[in-house]
Amino acid sequence: MNLSHVERYFSDFLSHMETPDNPFEIDGYRNKDNEDESTGKLPYPENLFVIGTVNIDETTYMFSPKVLDRANVVEFKPDKDDVLNMFSSASQEIKITPAKSGVSEAFLRLAKEIRSGKSRVDEWQMAEVRNVFTAIYDITEKNGYEFAYRTVREIKQYISAAYELSGQWADAEIYRAIDEQLLQKVLPKIHGNRKEIGTMLDELEAVCKQNGKELELSRRKIEQMKGKLAAVQYASFI
């Protein structure tokens, strides 16, 4: 998605995605109800979920805060053993287990309900989510990386979905969801030199360690960013 500046081709799509009553206008498409119209309108479908791959090298462009605000950034890194096992000459049969009937319909129904604001997460559990992100907000705000309504709304939706999809919902699952959202929604926007983000990364790491290993994914990523900062005096999420 970032072989070109994303804003040049994706900004209109993001706007339509957030305003369902503002349909796409398609040039050259005739509306069947009015053959005189040269421009048709297409509403954003509720069952459309966008997943894009990102290339990270010197030939690509990083995403802007506008895009990052509306996305969950999921970083995939291959396991060392999986990489080196490619040298093996033995071929392995690939087995794909099909999803059970009704999974896609259930997922769509869950997405619609969560988008409408429904949540079965207990108040005390959501209060714990708020406490952790309040501490994170206080740290990021001092450095100009505070998050706003959209980010909070999407984090809450993620927590609600995690609750429904989890086989059990204890402290470990709550902090796992918090950890994933800190990693996917907050950290990707952080970048800068040692003076700009050095202290902030230290304070965010302290928040992760306050919860033991429950925010382990974010703690490891922060350590990686601090390593870059020490080596080249600049760090970013990727």
Task: Label each residue range with its predicted role.
Residues 1-238:
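C-terminal regulatory/interaction module of P-loop NTP-utilizing enzymes
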